[in-house]
Amino acid sequence: MEQFECITVEEAYQKLRQGAAVLVDIRDPQSYAMGHAPQAFHLTNDTLGAFMRKHGFDTAVMVMCYHGNSSKGAAQYLLQQGYDAVYSIDGGFEAWHRRFPANVANGA
């Protein structure tokens, strides 16, 4: 994959359920703690190294932000680091929360 792909929250949900990709949330710590998609790894500058050690470059990565804008830059960055398949989630957490209100976890 030479460029990241934009996907819907429904597509992201299916990939997550199938174990076909991991999900990272790049929002600020307070927003993440107030609610995030289950199984979402809170990806920050401080946690990037741990994420990369845990998930090899052959891992498909889905990036979630607030509204689906910031995730595009993060997705491009992950591609540049060497990840083979990276997706940006259209609508971000706002769309996820609207579509899957029962699938929101709280806490850090």
Curated annotation (Swiss-Prot):
Residues 17-105 form the Rhodanese domain. Its EC number is 2.8.1.1. GO terms for cellular component: cytoplasm. SMART domains: RHOD. The active site is at C65. Pfam families: Rhodanese. One of its GO terms (biological process) is glycerol metabolic process. InterPro entries: GlpE_sulfurtransferase, Rhodanese-like_dom, Rhodanese-like_dom_sf, Thiosulf_sulfurTrfase. Keywords: Cytoplasm, Transferase. Coiled coil: none annotated. One of its GO terms (molecular function) is thiosulfate-cyanide sulfurtransferase activity. Its main location: cytoplasm. It is found in: Cytoplasm. It catalyses: thiosulfate + hydrogen cyanide = thiocyanate + sulfite + 2 H(+); thiosulfate + [thioredoxin]-dithiol = [thioredoxin]-disulfide + hydrogen sulfide + sulfite + 2 H(+). It is an enzyme of class 2 (transferase). Transferase that catalyzes the transfer of sulfur from thiosulfate to thiophilic acceptors such as cyanide or dithiols. May function in a CysM-independent thiosulfate assimilation pathway by catalyzing the conversion of thiosulfate to sulfite, which can then be used for L-cysteine biosynthesis. Belongs to the GlpE family. This is Thiosulfate sulfurtransferase GlpE.
